[in-house]
Amino acid sequence: MCSLFGLIDFKECLSTHTKNKILNTLARECQVRGTDATGIAYNFNDRLRIYKRPLPARKMKIHIPHGVNVVMGHTRMTTQGNAQFNQNNHPFLGKVDGSSFALAHNGVLWNDKELRMEENLPMTSVETDSYVAVQLLEQQKTLDFDSLKTMAEKVDGSFVFTVLDKDNSIWFVVGDNPLCVMFYDGFLIYASTQEILCKTLKKLRLKAPIDILEPQEGEIMRINRNGRITTGTFTPHTTFEHWWRKYPFYRSYYEDTPASYDDLFSVAKAFGVTADEVQALLDYGCSEEEIEEMLYDPELFHEMTGELLYAY
């Protein structure tokens, strides 16, 4: 479980200070979905810049230079690939036709190893499943609706991809994970969930947006630096394994023993965490492994569960 976030100041109406404030607030609110690493990508002086560190957003000060109007970000909860090796963190750098792009992913891909063999993709030291999306785009030597469609239809898993290109457009490739974009008069912000954006607005004391967009599964959306939107579609690659992972509660019909979280509750109790807090995260969709990892950061754990239990 990770989070995507970012902004496009398409009328160049925000000061650099305001953009940095928005980005830092967004990133910190995104910690609810990942604290292992934080990263951003933007274009500056005709070069794509990626800044990422194996740190939670609250410990990493995001600072973009004057003149940057498009920023793509990511907060990570590790599923594959050690976050301490920074190459495994998002966004990732890719190149097509001599131009650089940055890609970030929220979700889990299950056929990355198979794709590397089937597509004869080059060996890489990057250990994450997400990086196969970069390689599939590089293989096609172009970045457009067709290449993104091809990539999205080859990967199997849960995903939303964001891609920042050299022209300062952000591409959104929406699978079965959430995404929300809020529009204002002159700029937009986005994150993986509307809840994250609402909490960000509250902390920044921003007014209600003039429009909210939540793209659906199978949509590809490009928003350029002027705020113009163009769209395309793809057919999600769905397999029985994907369905089985997405709807694990169906397993209870076939397993002799229903899932029990007694061990998890006992471990949590040793950390001073109540069963209600653990259950709130389970209901939210966190796995046992994710919850056990979060137990080692009690301050963040209680902050997250507090928001889930007492959300306004």
Predicted regions and their residues:
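Conserved short alpha-helical segments that host acidic/polar catalytic motifs at enzyme active sites
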Residues: 1-312
